[in-house]
C-alpha cells in the first residue's frame, strides 16, 4: 500500500509544472520577463530529469535554450471544430530535435545538445537507459503540423523526415511526443477552446475570483484556499500543494547545488538563485526606490526596503498577532513561543535562538572585534557596545528618570538608579 502511495506521488508530468502564454501575451512581456520565464522553465525541466522523470518535449527545450519565441503551441483538430485551426509550431528557423538530452547536462545548469552519429534523419528509436533518453536526429520545418486527434486517440505526424515505421510507435516515444504540454483542443467542446484561443479565462475561482484558461490550473489554484497538499516528500514527510515545489524541496535532502557561478565558483540549488547572484559581479542595481532613490540589486530586497516607507507588515505571528515587515523576522520571533534554540556554539555548546546571536557569541572565542570607534580606536565585538561607548565622546545622556529627571548615558545605569525610588 505504501509502495502504491509512493508511486502515485512520483507521477509528475511536465504539464503539472508548465506555464504558458498566448502569442499576444508573449508579446506583452519585456526582455527581463521573457528571460526569467526561460530560466524558470529550464530549471523545472532539469529538476524533473534529476529525479528520474522522462525528458519534456525536445522542441520546447530547444526553443527555451535558443531564446526563440515561446507563445502557445496549440494542436488543432479540424477547420470545423476548433478556432485554433490546426495551429502550427512557430519558429523562425527549422527546429532540430536534440538527439541526446542528458541528465548530467541539466545538472550543470545548461543543456548540452549532442548530435547523433546516425545517418538516418528520421525521428526513430527511443530508449530510456541509465537516466538518458536517447533520440535519433529529426528535423521539422516551420510549417510542420503536429495534429493530435484526441477524439480518435490517434497521432498524426506530418512533415519533412518524419516516417511512420514501427520504431516511431514505441509507447514511450508516443507518450513523449503527444504529451499535453501546452494546450490540447477538445473536439467535444469547441466553444471552450475558442475562449482559450481568444485569451480569456473561463475558469473562475469562487473564493477570490481569479480566472484561469484551463480547469487544471483552477484545481491547482484552489489548493491555496483548501490547504490541500497532495505532494509529500518521502524523505521527511513534508507536503506541498504543487509538484514543482516538491521537486525543488527535494534538493535540500540531496544537498546538491547544480548551478555554479562562472565568476567566483559559488554554487546554488536553483538557477533563479544563480541569476540573482550574478549582478554582484556586474554591479548592476536596476531596482530604485522612488522615495529615497536608494538602488538595489535584487527585486526582493527592494520590496522589503519599500515597506520601511509604507509601514506595511504582512507577516503576522499566529500566536500573539505581532506583525513584521520581513518573513525572516517573523521566523526569528516565532522561536520565542516554541522555546527552541537551534543554533549551537561548537566551542562551548551554548545554544541560541537565531544565527545572528550565535555569530556575535562566537566572537568571544575568536577574539574578533569588528566594530571600532572612530574617535579613540577602541574596538568591540558587538555594534550595540560601540553605540553605548560613543556616548562617552558625545556627552549625550539619553536615558532620563521619570521620577527625578536625572539623566544617564546607559539604560542599565538608569535601571539601577530607579531602584532608589522603589
Swiss-Prot record:
One of its GO terms (molecular function) is RNA polymerase II transcription regulatory region sequence-specific DNA binding. Its main location: nucleus. One of its GO terms (biological process) is positive regulation of transcription by RNA polymerase II. SUPFAM superfamilies: beta-beta-alpha zinc fingers, KRAB domain (Kruppel-associated box). InterPro entries: GLI_C2H2-zinc-finger, KRAB, KRAB_dom_sf, Znf_C2H2_sf, Znf_C2H2_type. Keywords: DNA-binding, Metal-binding, Nucleus, Repeat, Transcription, Transcription regulation, Zinc, Zinc-finger. Pfam families: KRAB (PF01352), zf-C2H2 (PF00096). SMART domains: KRAB, ZnF_C2H2. Transmembrane segments: none annotated. It is found in: Nucleus. CDD domains: KRAB_A-box. A zinc finger (C2H2-type) spans 203-225, 231-253, 259-281, 287-309, 315-337, 343-365, 371-393, 399-421. Residues 113-158 are annotated as: Disordered. Belongs to the krueppel C2H2-type zinc-finger protein family. May be involved in transcriptional regulation. This is Zinc finger protein 550. It comes from Homo sapiens (Human).
Amino acid at each position: 500500500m505504501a509502495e502504491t502511495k509512493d508511486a502515485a506521488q512520483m507521477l509528475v508530468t511536465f504539464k503539472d509544472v508548465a506555464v504558458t502564454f498566448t502569442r499576444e501575451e508573449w508579446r506583452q512581456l519585456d526582455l527581463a520577463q521573457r528571460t526569467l520565464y526561460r530560466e524558470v522553465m529550464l530549471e523545472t525541466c532539469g529538476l524533473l530529469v534529476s529525479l528520474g522523470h522522462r525528458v519534456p518535449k525536445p522542441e520546447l527545450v530547444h526553443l527555451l535554450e535558443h531564446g526563440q519565441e515561446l507563445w502557445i503551441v496549440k494542436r488543432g483538430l479540424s477547420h470545423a471544430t476548433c478556432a485554433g485551426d490546426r495551429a502550427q509550431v512557430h519558429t523562425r528557423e527549422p527546429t532540430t530535435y536534440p538527439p541526446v538530452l542528458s541528465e548530467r547536462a541539466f545538472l550543470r545548469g545548461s543543456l548540452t545538445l549532442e548530435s547523433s552519429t546516425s545517418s538516418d534523419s528520421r525521428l526513430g528509436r527511443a530508449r530510456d537507459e541509465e537516466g538518458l533518453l536517447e533520440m535519433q536526429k529529426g528535423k521539422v520545418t516551420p510549417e510542420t503540423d503536429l495534429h493530435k486527434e484526441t477524439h480518435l486517440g490517434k497521432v498524426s505526424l506530418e512533415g519533412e523526415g518524419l516516417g511512420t515505421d514501427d520504431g516511431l510507435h514505441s509507447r514511450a516515444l508516443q507518450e513523449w511526443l503527444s504529451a499535453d504540454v501546452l494546450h490540447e483542443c477538445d473536439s467535444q467542446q469547441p466553444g471552450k477552446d475558442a475562449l482559450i484561443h481568444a485569451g480569456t479565462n473561463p475558469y473562475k475561482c469562487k473564493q477570490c475570483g481569479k480566472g484561469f484558461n484551463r480547469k487544471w490550473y483552477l484545481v491547482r489554484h484552489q489548493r491555496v484556499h483548501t490547504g490541500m497538499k497532495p505532494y509529500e516528500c518521502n524523505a521527511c514527510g513534508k507536503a506541498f500543494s504543487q509538484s514543482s515545489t516538491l521537486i525543488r524541496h527535494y534538493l535540500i535532502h540531496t544537498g546538491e547545488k547544480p548551478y555554479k557561478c562562472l565568476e567566483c565558483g559559488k554554487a546554488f540549488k536553483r538557477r533563479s538563485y544563480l541569476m540573482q547572484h550574478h549582478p554582484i559581479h556586474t554591479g548592476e542595481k536596476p531596482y530604485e526606490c522612488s522615495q529615497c532613490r536608494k538602488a538595489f540589486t535584487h527585486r526582493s530586497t527592494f520590496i522589503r526596503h519599500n515597506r520601511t516607507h509604507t509601514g506595511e507588515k504582512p507577516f503576522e505571528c499566529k500566536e500573539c498577532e505581532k506583525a513584521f515587515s520581513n518573513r525572516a523576522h517573523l521566523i526569528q520571533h516565532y522561536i520565542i513561543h516554541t522555546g527552541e534554540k537551534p543554533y549551537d556554539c561548537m566551542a562551548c555548546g551554548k545554544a541560541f535562538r537565531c544565527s545572528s546571536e550565535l555569530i556575535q557569541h562566537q566572537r568571544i572565542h575568536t577574539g574578533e572585534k569588528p566594530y571600532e570607534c572612530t574617535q579613540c580606536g577602541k574596538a568591540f565585538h558587538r555594534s550595540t557596545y560601540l553605540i553605548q561607548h560613543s556616548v562617552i565622546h558625545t556627552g549625550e545622556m539619553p536615558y532620563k528618570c521619570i521620577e527625578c529627571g536625572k539623566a544617564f548615558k546607559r539604560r542599565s545605569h538608569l535601571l539601577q538608579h530607579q531602584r532608589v525610588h522603589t
